[in-house]
């Protein structure tokens, strides 16, 4: 996996092997290896590396979340099976693989703000303005990043939804039913398409889509 931060540093990682930060400066490449064995990473089981709106780097793992400070990653939340991070202003939210959402603010300890459902497995997420939509085993939940309120999305209550983003930044959701939902990221307009007949979809092990808008808006 690869992530490039705003400073141009490239972060490379593989679950179980820690990560590497690669920097290009003055015509030379240098790198720092973050690994538990090097005492600069709490866990090698990395699930994501993300940058927030303030430019801070967060490393999520199956064993907790760490913030990168200099050339070391400092543990900020233990016993958290990290799935996704979401930045909202100066606030940072962490979502676990079983639907627990925690909040981290500058100068404060991380704290749990809500739990979605009864520990349902999380499949994917997407953001629509101030709403963080989380697709789980038992449908979708809407977490408002400003108010921290949770609701159920009736129009997008899609169990086991997987999200794909097209070349215009809009969302497409599918869940092995042969049906695909289009969501406009700006207007929140939703339209569904039955691309594979429901009685044929079980012949397919895994749905795969590649969605592109062309210059004719098709």
Across the structure, where does each feature detected by a protein language model lie?
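Carboxylate-rich, polar loop motifs that coordinate divalent cations or form catalytic acidic clusters
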Residues: 1-218
């Amino acid at each position: 996996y690869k992530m490039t931060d705003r400073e141009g540093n490239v972060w490379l990682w593989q679950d179980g092997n820690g990560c590497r930060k690669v920097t290009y400066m003055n015509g030379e490449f240098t790198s720092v290896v973050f690994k538990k064995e090097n005492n600069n990473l709490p866990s090698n089981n990395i699930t994501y590396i993300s940058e927030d709106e303030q430019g801070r780097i967060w490393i999520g793992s199956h064993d907790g979340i760490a913030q990168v400070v200099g050339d070391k990653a400092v543990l900020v939340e233990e016993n958290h099976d990290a799935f996704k991070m979401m930045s909202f202003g100066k606030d940072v939210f962490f979502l676990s693989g079983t639907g627990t959402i925690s909040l981290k603010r500058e100068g404060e300890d991380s704290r749990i703000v809500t739990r979605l459902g009864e520990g349902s497995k999380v499949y994917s997420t997407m953001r629509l303005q101030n709403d963080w939509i989380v697709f789980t085993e038992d449908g979708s939940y809407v977490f408002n990043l400003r108010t921290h309120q949770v609701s159920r999305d009736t129009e997008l209550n899609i169990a086991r939804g997987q999200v794909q983003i097209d070349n215009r930044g809009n969302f497409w959701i599918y869940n092995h039913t042969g049906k695909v939902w289009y969501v406009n990221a700006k207007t929140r307009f939703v339209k569904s398409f039955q691309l594979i007949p429901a009685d044929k979809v079980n012949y397919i092990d895994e749905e795969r889509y590649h969605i592109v808008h062309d210059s004719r808006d098709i």
